[in-house]
Amino acid sequence: MCSTFQIIAHLHKLNSMDSDTFIFCLEAVADIETETASEVVKNLEQLAFKQGIASIYKTCDTIESLEESLNTLLYDDHNFKNYEIIYLVMQGEGNTICLNEYYYTLEEIAEIFEGKMKGKILHFANSKVLDLSNDEAQYFLDVTGARAISGYGTSSSTLTSSILDTLFFSLFEE
């Protein structure tokens, strides 16, 4: 299955960057075969242009395409260590994500990527409320090796978190 794949970078700024912070963004869509202009892509482009933070943007519509995208990043991208932030833009509630009307718990996701997210920060956009107990969060971090998991306590169908997410990401460049 192919998916939307874009490398977002402003080359002039990338060449002069002191740090190697990159963002890998994975957005859930109804059908990866249908290309649509996403607000997320526009915001990542602005982040690259203004802050010099490059990113890779992909879409997924099933748990298999999510796993395939992250495995491609893990095993085929020799710069994976530079991707400090894994940015997930998908629906869900509490301890689950939703892909094409199927719900997966973060425990299931953790087990798929057991030990593979060492040192990464997983950040969820506000389209998915991140409502985890301390034990659930610690389990996810312990199993995946991730450094942190972050997100929002409320979602909004009328207002996205893109601007706040952009500010959050820019903190890693300072």
Where are the language model's segments positioned?
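A domain-level signal for caspase-like cysteine endopeptidase catalytic cores
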Residues: 2-83, 121-125, 143-144
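Conserved beta-strand elements of beta-rich interaction domains across eukaryotes
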Residues: 28-31, 93, 129, 156
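Surface-exposed beta-strand edges and their flanking turn/coil or helix-capping segments
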Residues: 38, 69-71, 101, 137, ...
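Short amphipathic alpha-helical segments and helix-helix/interface helices
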Residues: 41, 45, 106-114, 134-141, ...
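Glycine-rich loops and low-complexity Gly/Arg-rich segments
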Residues: 48-51, 80-84, 110-113, 147-150, ...
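Short C-terminal domain-edge/linker segments immediately following a structured domain
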Residues: 53-58, 115-120, 153-158
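Catalytic-core segments of thiol-dependent peptidases
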Residues: 59-131
